[in-house]
Structures are given as structure tokens and as C-alpha cells.
């Protein structure tokens, strides 16, 4: 799938030391939302910071999920393991890497 215009939600969370596994279990939603096309999780080398990147079909689909009870429950489950959280919502595109 080509992403000429993507809607991208990026969250960064600093975790309490030693809580990565518990956080990972809490982070996974009980159901994946309609409109989410892709999702990635990236951890720092020490496991104390996680970046979540999700690609959405529209700004509206992301907003529906953000305001949903599924997301509210997920956030409540993650809260005991999170020290700090930052988030941003962006539009972007996939860059083509030239063949070598």
C-alpha cells in the first residue's frame, strides 16, 4: 500500500524502570480500531521509553478511537507504568528510497 497522504499519531511515553513487560501487556488494545491501517511500537535500548506510531485512514477515524471507551480503558491500564507522556497527530507521506 502506498501512503501518499497518511494520518499519523505518535505517542512517546517514559516508563517507570522495570515496568516494560507490564506496560506492554496494558498497552495492547482489547480490539483494534476501524480505520487504523498500521501500528508500530519502538523501545529505547534500556526499555524505559516507548514510541507508538499508528497510521490512520482519516483524522476522524483516529479521533473516534481516541474518544472511545476502549482507548479510555487502555489508558487507565497503562497509567501505573507511565511517568510522562507526549503525543502529536500529523499528516505525512511515505518517502521512496532510490534503488541502488
What is each stretch, according to the model?
Residues 1-100:
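Short S/T/G/P-rich N-terminal loop/turn motif that feeds into the first structured element of a domain
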Amino acid at each position: 500500500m502506498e501512503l501518499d497522504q497518511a494520518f499519523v499519531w505518535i505517542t512517546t511515553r517514559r516508563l517507570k524502570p522495570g515496568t516494560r513487560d507490564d506496560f506492554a501487556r496494558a498497552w495492547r488494545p482489547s480490539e483494534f480500531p476501524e480505520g487504523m491501517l498500521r501500528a508500530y511500537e519502538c523501545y529505547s535500548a534500556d526499555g524505559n521509553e516507548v514510541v507508538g506510531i499508528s497510521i490512520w485512514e482519516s483524522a476522524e477515524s483516529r479521533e473516534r478511537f481516541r474518544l472511545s471507551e476502549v482507548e479510555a480503558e487502555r489508558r487507565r491500564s497503562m497509567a501505573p507504568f507511565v511517568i510522562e507522556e507526549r503525543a502529536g497527530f500529523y499528516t505525512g507521506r511515505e518517502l521512496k528510497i532510490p534503488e541502488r
